[in-house]
Every structure is written in structure tokens, then in C-alpha cells.
Amino acid sequence: MKMKMMVRIYFVSLSLLLFHSYAIDIENEITEFFNKMRDTLPAKDSKWLNPVCMFGGTMNDMAALGEPFSAKCPPIEDSLLSHRYKDYVVKWERLEKNRRRQVSNKRVKHGDLWIANYTSKFSNRRYLCTVTTKNGDCVQGVVRSHVWKPSSCIPKTYELGTYDKYGIDLYCGILYANHYNNITWYKDNKEINIDDFKYSQAGKELIIHNPELEDSGRYDCYVHYDDVRIKNDIVVSRCKILTVIPSQDHRFKLILDPKINVTIGEPANITCSAVSTSLFVDDVLIEWENPSGWIIGLDFGVYSILTSRGGITEATLYFENVTEEYIGNTYTCRGHNYYFDKTLTTTVVLE
């Protein structure tokens, strides 16, 4: 009995030792990965890095003109590194050609870079952030910002009977800044009462319960921020055009010639089509599979291109240069949506 207990303790200790060694190897590989990333930085960025600090990556963040902008320090946001840093402070600096300047406190919120009103003068600026822990460990990252114009109104179509028990969710697409105070929603210019019966709110999403055709309309979300330098709230808006349609027929017909007539040394192609029964539904996905059953994408030699319009989805299989090895091969066209799955095959033959 004593011997069995000793053997068990030995194996448990060995397992813990192996796991610890494996974890150390993983951490070392992560560090090596970011060291290599540091080596690829342009000189105008790398010259400002502190050799004592670990490098934690770069981030290219999008910003909208006239709206708030925020960015996290890359190592804090990166899933490979974030677990290493818990209690820390973040210092932000703006990188210029021959100097770096500390970012003022008014442009930092909760440790993130914060610009209350992003204008063109901020575009393409580079920022260096340094994360320092209580133990004195430090890691640095580089952030660049670029202007991106948000869509004015994004259309969304919902078919009754699809996910009625979950409701229709509308996302307020404020992708450029966090730390907002609250969001108010309007339908057709009238403020929505969040009563948790017909309408509820979860973060940036409005959920419309018990969907019906009358829920169609224009939905605007107004995002309220605050800033110590501005008396009134900063307000940013996004728009959705919701169209609710009756339940549709999701059947479709798959069309494909059973033979591909080819000539050695020349290109060839064949198109597989899916025609939906309902013109309002465009939910069929088509994939080509090679003789081994693997999906064909943008491969060399043989590749497929997918297009969709007006209830008709097409996937064209292209052969850049037909060789003898293709003759006799059978390729499968698979069309499917949430409800149905269909396949047809075609064989390569010499003309």
C-alpha cells in the first residue's frame, strides 16, 4: 500500500513538472514571437523602444472624423500577453520624427488613449505605450490610427419565423471608441421605451422581441460620451434600416452540367448554379469539392469564384491549364442553406 502511494505521488509530481516545463516553453515561444515582430518594425518606430522592455506588438486602429476615438495598448489587448499583466500603469507618448512627446492626461481614459474629437490632424499619428507592472516589468506597443468613414445607414433584413424566440438584434456600430455613458434608440425619429417586454437592451444591442412586420423601419442609436473639457455630452449616432419580411420558401434548384469538356493545354471552367424558389431569399452557399472531398478555394491551378444576385447563386470552377492528370476526375458541387443540402457532380472529359 505504501509503495502504491509513493508511485502515485511520483507520477503526480512528474505530471506537474512536465506541465510546468510545457508552460515555460509556451511563454518562451510567445516572447520569441514578439521579439521577431520587433525586428520587423520600421526604424522610425523601433528607435524609440526601450531595450529593457519586452515588445508587445502593434495595432492599427480605425477612427471616424468628428467622433471620439480610443485605443488600448496592444499587449493589454493581445490574448497571448494580456494574462501576464494585471496590476499596471500605462504611459502614452506620441512619436514624431526626431522626438517623442508624452500624451497629456486629458487624452488618456482608464489607461487607454482617448481623443474626444478625432480630426484629420490625428490621422496616421503613431503612439508608443509603455505598460509597467508593480514588479517593475515593462512591455511596449505601438498604435497607429487611420480614418475610416462609417456607413450612413446599414440595411438589415429579418425573416419572420427565423429566430423569433430570440428576437431581432440591432447592433449599434460604434467600433471606434469605448467608455460611453449610455445609448438611446429611436425608431422613425421616436424614442424607444426600453420596457424589457417589446424592447430590451444589452450593451450595444437593441433586441426587438416578438417580431412582426410592423417592426420594419429606420432605427437610430445615439451614443453619449462625456469629456471633462466639454460641458455637454458628446453624441455619436449610427443608423439601421430594418426590413421584416414574411416567412419564405427556402427551397432551391441546383443546376450543373454532368461533363466538363476540356482541351489539354488550355484553360476551362464550369458553373454550378443554385436558383432559389423565393426571390427575397439569397441564403444558398455553394462550394466545390475536389475528387478527395476537399473544398476548393483560391488554389493554384484549380480554383472557384462565388457570386450571388437576385436569388441566384453561382460558383464557377476554373482550370488555369488543363493537363492529363485532370482527365476523368469528378468534382462535386455542394449547395446548402440552413434548411437544405444538395450535391451534383461533373466529370472532366476530353473534347
UniProtKB/Swiss-Prot annotation:
Q: Give the record's glycosylation annotations as residue positions.
A: N117, N182, N261, N269, N321
Report the principal subcellular site.
Answer: secreted
The organism's superkingdom is given as Viruses
Task: Name all Ig-like V-type domain ranges.
Answer: 246-345
- Cellular compartment(s): Secreted
- The keyword Cell division is annotated on this UniProt entry: no
Q: Where is the Ig-like C2-type domain?
A: 65-137, 155-237
Keywords on record:
Disulfide bond, Early protein, Glycoprotein, Host-virus interaction, Immunoglobulin domain, Inhibition of host innate immune response by virus, Inhibition of host interferon signaling pathway by virus, Interferon antiviral system evasion, Repeat, Secreted, Signal, Viral immunoevasion
Q: Name one GO biological process term.
A: symbiont-mediated suppression of host innate immune response
Q: Name one GO cellular component term.
A: extracellular region
Leader sequence range is 1-23
The stated induction of this gene product is: Expressed in the early phase of the viral replicative cycle.
Task: Show the disulfide pairing.
Answer: C73-C129, C172-C221, C272-C333
State if Metal-binding is listed as a keyword. Answer: no
Family, per the entry?
Answer: Belongs to the interleukin-1 receptor family.
Q: What does this protein do?
A: Counteracts the antiviral effects of host IFN-alpha/beta and key IFN-inducible proteins involved in viral RNA degradation suxh as host OAS1. Acts as a soluble IFN-alpha receptor and thus inhibits the interaction between host IFN-alpha and its receptor.
Q: How does it assemble?
A: Interacts with host IFNA1.
User: What is the recorded name of this protein?
Assistant: Soluble interferon alpha/beta receptor OPG204
Species source reads Monkeypox virus
